[in-house]
């Protein structure tokens, strides 16, 4: 009997300990309980798109395997790598230093899942006639570091082998898994077949200078493209930078990105997020196309040449400087894939996307300049839903001869156009002019000009003391202008100056209209018979979501250079906007021109020797993150249930 009593006491003690552990797990976050995890395996949060390893280009290479390439052979000092029929095989996790030349072969990373590989390129020249120069067939993540001061080059042939094609190989660099590039050296990539870099998962560029030319996409990845502290130049026969996954995104924190492309300069099946850096985009199609959202909170984005500037379902500008020279809309918020246009895209008719998805343009900060000197029907800001402006500076100049709107919103589908802050000077044609709604909280003026105004005309708004609240030398001819700034007040008198003409006005309503455009400036009575529906809806019979404009504008001949670079041709120089007067208090105008976790099992090279474990990078130490409260609760509850079941079984056994 005493034995049973002692056993009962032990069971009670275990039960009490289990309850305490369960409470500890449930309150783990408050008590600071932490667990060791692999930081590169974690999904990046929107607040931090880069891991410590992505940003560390100074990892310790003292224990790395050193490889010197020599034509079709290599000198290897260390373990984990071997040559196989002219290809360098990286067969185990760890760090490697590469230099020299491969005349016709690939560097192939083929390790176990969960393995990480660091490659330091220190003067590498790779050529492969029928496959990728660098393949990441299997690894959790590959870190490619460009050694300080080094010059590296990779070039592929014009056709790939059937084996490479069967594997889906589409780039000079091809990665099945995550790829991260950093360092302070340079890398030139010349693709003669398809893409420059083709990554199935995430691509991070966190340093170095990259020049990539390709007949298709210069960079193509599935999950995400993230860039900081790098200088990247892309030339592409199709899209410059493309992210194809529906949940994918493009993220730029800092650095310099220059793109010349025939297709979209930047194309994302998900989002595009710009927080800093400098972008210059020259393209025959969209400057930036995002199937979901575009947001810009900092940096400088210049699009000197494009068909359409930025196209997305939602567009938000909260900071930075954005300038667009376009042939069609500057900003276009359209709600579905079917509503997106562009040269070379699927032949789809546009629809009124406001009926299916919420669309909007919101400007709360930064500066926006849109200039369209073409005479076609186009809009400066075009939304199938709402347009709201609460801050920043918006300047729009559209050619007077087209039936365009400086600001066009989906009024027919319930959209609103409101201003509550910021500065706006938006010039275009009188025939389709739309002002801000009466529901706005900041005053505005829609002013129509009785004789039209030629390009270069100065537009100003003066207060009752003769001080200029707004002033801009407008690049294109115009017959209508929208003016708004925080200093405008109901009941006050102002003077609108257009060149040598001026008119005194008094603001008696929040959104006022003045002036009178004479029909003679349109060559007689205006022809409304061919007017297209507003709100971004394309006419029937024309694909791509734009009015019928005949042949695409001539972008110039694009000869193929003898060195195999993608045909880019000469790009026109954008209009010179230097020397323009800066409106008072409008801000700067856009300038125109880890040792983390197990390293896995290592395959044995063909010579039969067992490779030793290479030393990991210096920063390969695991990092800790807080366990979620939900996970802790589940762990504790499961433990408690398991213990209760054991005690119950023992009790039945004893009584039995």
Predicted regions and their residues:
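A composition-driven surface/loop motif
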Residues: 2-656
């Amino acid at each position: 009997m005493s034995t049973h009593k002692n056993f009962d006491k032990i069971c009670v003690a275990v039960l009490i300990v289990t309850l305490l552990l369960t409470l500890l797990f449930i309150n783990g976050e408050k008590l600071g309980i932490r667990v060791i995890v692999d930081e590169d395996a974690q999904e990046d949060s929107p607040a931090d798109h880069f891991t410590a390893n992505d940003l560390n280009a100074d990892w310790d290479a003292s224990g790395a395997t050193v490889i010197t390439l020599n034509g079709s052979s290599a000198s290897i000092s260390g373990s984990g790598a071997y040559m196989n029929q002219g290809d360098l095989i990286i067969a185990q996790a760890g760090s490697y230093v590469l230099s020299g030349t491969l005349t016709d072969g690939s560097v192939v990373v083929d390790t176990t899942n969960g393995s990480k590989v660091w490659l330091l390129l220190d003067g590498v020249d790779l050529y492969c006639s029928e496959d990728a120069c660098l393949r990441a067939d299997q690894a959790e993540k590959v870190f490619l570091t460009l050694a300080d001061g080094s010059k590296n080059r990779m070039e592929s042939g014009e056709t790939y082998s059937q084996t490479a094609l069967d594997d889906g190989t589409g780039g000079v660099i091809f990665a099945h898994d995550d790829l991260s590039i950093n360092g302070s050296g340079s890398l030139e990539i010349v693709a003669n077949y398809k893409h420059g870099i083709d990554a199935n998962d995430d691509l991070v560029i966190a340093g170095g200078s990259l020049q990539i030319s390709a007949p298709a996409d210069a960079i193509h990845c599935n999950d995400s493209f993230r860039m900081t502290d790098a200088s990247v130049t892309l030339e592409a026969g199709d899209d410059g930078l493309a992210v194809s996954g529906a949940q994918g995104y493009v993220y730029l924190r800092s650095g310099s990105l220059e793109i010349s492309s025939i297709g979209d300069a930047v194309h994302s099946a998900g989002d595009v997020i710009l927080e800093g850096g400098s972008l210059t985009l020259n393209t025959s199609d969209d400057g930036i196309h995002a199937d979901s959202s575009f947001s810009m909170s900092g940096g400088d984005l210049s699009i000197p040449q494009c068909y359409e500037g930025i196209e997305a379902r939602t567009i938000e500008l909260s900071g930075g400087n954005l300038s667009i020279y376009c042939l069609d809309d500057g900003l276009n918020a359209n709600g579905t894939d079917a509503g997106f246009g562009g040269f070379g895209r699927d032949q789809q008719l546009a629809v009124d996307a406001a009926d299916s998805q919420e669309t909007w343009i919101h400007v709360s900060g930064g500066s926006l300049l849109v200039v369209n000197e073409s005479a076609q029907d186009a809009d400066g800001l075009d939304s199938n839903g709402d347009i709201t402006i609460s801050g920043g500076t918006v300047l729009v100049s559209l050619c007077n001869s087209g039936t365009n709107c400086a600001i066009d919103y989906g009024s027919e589908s319930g959209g609103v156009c409101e201003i509550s802050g910021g500065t706006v000077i938006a010039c275009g044609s009188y025939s389709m002019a739309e002002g801000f709604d009466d529901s706005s909280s900041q005053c505005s003026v829609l002013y129509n000009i009785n004789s039209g105004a030629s390009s270069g005309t100065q537009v100003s708004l003066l207060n009752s003391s003769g001080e200029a609240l707004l002033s801009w030398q407008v690049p294109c001819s115009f017959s209508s202008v929208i003016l708004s700034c925080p200093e405008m007040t109901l009941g006050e008198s102002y003077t609108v100056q257009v060149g040598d003409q001026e008119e005194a006005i008094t603001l008696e309503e929040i959104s006022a209209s003045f002036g009178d455009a004479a029909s003679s400036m349109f060559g007689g009575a205006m022809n409304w018979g061919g007017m297209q529906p507003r709100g971004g809806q394309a006419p029937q019979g024309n694909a791509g979501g734009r009015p019928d404009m005949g042949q695409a504008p001539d972008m110039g001949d694009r000869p193929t250079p003898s060195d195999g670079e993608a045909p880019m041709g000469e790009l026109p120089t954008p209009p010179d906007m230097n020397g323009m007067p800066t409106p008072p208090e409008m801000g700067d105008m856009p300038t125109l021109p880890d040792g983390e976790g197990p390293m896995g099992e290592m395959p044995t090279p063909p010579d039969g020797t067992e490779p030793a474990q290479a030393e990991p990078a210096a920063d390969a130490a695991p990092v800790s993150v807080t366990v979620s409260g939900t996970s802790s609760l589940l762990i504790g509850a499961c433990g408690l249930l398991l213990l209760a079941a054991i005690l119950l079984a023992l009790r039945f056994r004893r009584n039995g």
